[in-house]
Amino acid sequence: MAEELRQQVPLMKEMLTAMGVTIVEKEGYEADDLLGTIAKQSEAQGLEVSIVSGDRDLLQLASDHIKIRIPKTKRTGTEIEDYLAKDVVEKYQVTPLQFIDVKALMGDSADNIPGVPGIGEKTATALIVSYGSIENAHDHLEEIKPNRAKQNLSEHYDMAQMSKELATIEIHAPIEYSLEDAKLGNLFTEEAYLMCKRLEFKNMLSRFDIDAPKNLAEEHFTFVTDKKQISDIFKKAKKAGHIGCCLLPGEGIITEQLSLFEQPKEQQVIEGMSIAFSEEDICYLSAGTEVSAEELLEEIRELSGGQTKVSVMDLKETLKTLPLPENDRYFDASVAAYLLNPLKNDYPYEDLAKDYAGLMIPSKTDLLGKESPVKAKQAKPEAFLKYICYMAYIPWKTRDRLLEELNNTGMQTLYDTIELPLVYTLSDMEKEGVHVDAEELKRYGEELAAQIAVLEKEIYEGAGETFNINSPKQLGHILFEKLEMPYGKKTKTGYSTAADVLEKLAVEYPLVSKILEYRQLAKLKSTYADGLANFIEEDGRIHTTFQQTVTATGRLSSTDPNLQNIPIRMELGRMIRKVFLPKDGYIFVDADYSQIELRILAHMSGDEMLIQAYREAQDIHRMTASQVFHTPFEEVTDLQRRNAKAVNFGIVYGISSFGLSQDLSISKKEAQEYIERYFESYPKIKEFLDGCVEKAKKDGYSVTMFGRRRPLPEISSSNFMQRSFGERIAMNAPIQGTAADIIKIAMNRVHRRLIDEGLKSRLLLQVHDELLIEAAPDEVDEVKKILDEEMKGAADLSVELEIDTHTGKNWYEAK
C-alpha cells in the first residue's frame, strides 16, 4: 500500500464510524475474503446481494443472487457493469468458479499470483473452457495444444495449484457479523458533518441538512447572571471536587493584591467565566450589575484555594487574569495533550474532545468565525455560549483520560515536575518583559539603513543598472543572463537565487557577496530594527509570548516578537542586543550552558574518551581535530579545529556526509571520511546513535533522559528520504530533547529560588541554552550563585554541566 494511502486509512475508518457504517476487519484476512464471507452468508439467508468494486477477482462470487457491480469510467461518465453468474459465462465463457482457474493460470502481479509462465489470458481461458479446471487439464496433458502450453503446465503444475489457492476468495472467514450490523440509518450525521468541516470536504457538506449539529452536552449549557444562582453554582462546584473553567478577559485592569508575591500587579478584568463540574452543570457566569468581575474572581480564587481541582485549556492564559498558587491541583489540558502528541501545531478543545473523549464538536471558528469571543457575546450569543462552555467542559471532561495516558506513557513525572511548574515560570517572565531603548533601536535602524544604501549603490554599479534587488526574477536575470554567471537553476518562475546558489557564486564574484550581505542587513532592519519597535508597550518593555506546546523536541519558542532567533553570528547582528536594557539601577546577569548537547552525548553514550576529556577540561574540538585528522594535539590548526567543531555538533544533529560537505565546502567523500574517523575515535557514540535508531524503529518514538517522547512516523516510511530524515531525528531528538528538559528544569529552579529568597531580581528571558536575569545591584553575587547552583544542578550527568556567566549594562555586554 502506498504511504500516502496508508496514512489516510485511519481517517477513512473515522469517517465511516461517524456515518454509522459498520467496519468489518479480521487480522490475517483480506478485504475480498470478508466480502466473500458476508456475501455467501447473506445469500444463504435468502437475500439479494450486490457487491460494488473495481476488482474483477470478485466475479468468482457471482451467482443467481449475488451481483458484482463494476464501475467503469467512460468519456460520458461512470457506468456500472452488472454481473450475475450468467453474465460471467456470457462475457468470459467460463463460470464464476472457473474464473478462479483462469486467473491462476494467467497470474496477476498486482495480487502476487505467479501463474504459469508462458500462459496468458487467451490460452488460460481456452484451457478452462475445454477442460473445466486446472486439475482436469493436467489429467489430459497429452491432448493440450499448443505443445508449449502443455509443457509449461506440466513443468509448473505445482505453481498453478498454488496460484489457484491464492486466487480463491475465502468464503468462510471467522468474522462476527449480523444483518443488524448492515442496517444503515442516516449517513449524514452530526459527527460526520463536523468531520467534513474539519477536513474541508466542501462538496460533501452541501449534502447535509444541518447547519450546526448539537452535542448532548450542549443541552445543559446555560447563561447565568442572577447573584443567588451564581452563589449556588459555586457551592455546588465546591462539593464536586473538580471543575473546568475558562475566564473571558475584558477590557481594563484591576490593581488589587491578587498575586501571591508581595508586590501588587495589574490584572485584566473579566467579563465572565464558564464553569463545568458535571455533565449537567455547564454554564457561563456573567459579570454585570448583580455580580462584579472582582466578585467572580474572588469566588473562583476561594474555590481553587481549597482542595478543588481546577482544569483549564490554557493555564498560562488563565494566570493573566487569575494568579493561582503553584500546585498540582491545577491542570493544563493543552500542555498534557502536547506531551502525548508533540507533532501537532496546536491543541484546540475540539481536538481534545475527539482524541480523549470521543466527541465531535464544533470548533471556535465554526461557532464564532473571525469574531473575538467578547464581540461574539453580543453579536452571536448562542454560538458564544457554546464556545465558552466547551472551553470549560472539555478540560473537565478529558482531565482523567489525559492523566491516565501520561501515566501509561511514563510522562506523568515530566508533566508534574517540569512542564506544569514551567507554566508559572513563563507566566511571570511574560509579565516582567524586558526593557528596550526605543531611541537606541532607532539609531540602530538608521545605521543599518545607511549601510544598506551603500550596498545598493555598489550592487547597481556592479550590475551596470538599477533593479529590484529583492526580486528573484530581476536578480536572476542580472546574474545568469546579463552577467552569465554559472550555477543558474532555471525554474518555472525564473532562476533560483536561493542562498545556497548565491553562496557558491560568492567565492568568485564580489557582487554576489554584496548581495548576500545586503540580504542579511535588510533582514536585520525589517525583523529587528523595524519589527521590535512595534512590540514596545507603554511600560517601555517588550512582553514576548513563550510557546510551550509548539516544538516536537520540547524546546521553547517565542512569538510577538520571536526572541529565539536574535542573531549571534554577525557582529552587526549581535549589536541588536545593545537595545535591551535592564530597568534603572539594575544590571543584566546572563548565564549560558557550555556545550550542553555534547556533554549530554558524552553522558548518554558513555564514551569514556569524551567523558574523560570533559573531566579534564580539555578543548573538545581540538581533541576531536587531533583524532579525526591524525594530528598531534598541540599541532592542530585553527581550521582543523573549526572543521572538528562542525563535525562534533553535526554528529549531534545526525548530519549526513552531504550536509557536512555543504557546511565545510568539501567533497562528500571527504566529509564521509571525517565522519568515519570520528566514529573510529568515539566508538561508543556510534553504538549509541545506532541504538537510538533501532529503538525508535521498534518503538515508533525516541525518548529523552527525562521520559519525553518524540513520535517518529517517518522512520517506518517506505520513502527513503522520509525514512532517512526519521533516522536523523532518532539520533538527535534524545539529545536535543534532553537539553530542552534541562534548561526548563534550570528555569524553574532559578525562578523559584529568586522568589523563595525574597530577591528583587527576576528571570526575564530564555534563548536556547541561555538565561537572562534583571538583577538588583546588591543581589548580583547572590544571583550568580543561584545560577551556578541551579543550572549546574539541573541534571546529574557523568560530566559536569558548565555555564558561562557575564554581567553588563545591556544584553550585548552581558553576553
Regions found by a protein language model. Give the residues of each.
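Active-site palm subdomain of RNA-directed nucleic acid polymerases
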Residues: 406-418, 422, 742, 746-767, ...
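C-terminal polymerase-core module
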Residues: 450-457, 461-513, 680-728, 732, ...
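Conserved "right-hand" nucleotidyltransferase catalytic core of DNA-directed polymerases
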Residues: 152, 156-288, 306-310, 371-372, ...
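Active-site-proximal helix-loop-helix substrate-binding element of RNase H-like nuclease domains
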Residues: 75-103, 263-407, 418, 422, ...
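Conserved catalytic core of nucleic-acid polymerases
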Residues: 377, 431, 543-544, 548-551, ...
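Extended two-metal-dependent nuclease catalytic cores across DNA- and RNA-processing enzymes
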Residues: 2-175
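Short beta-strand
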Residues: 51, 468-470, 762-767
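Function-dense linear segments that define catalytic or interfacial modules
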Residues: 274-279, 340-371, 387-394, 548-633
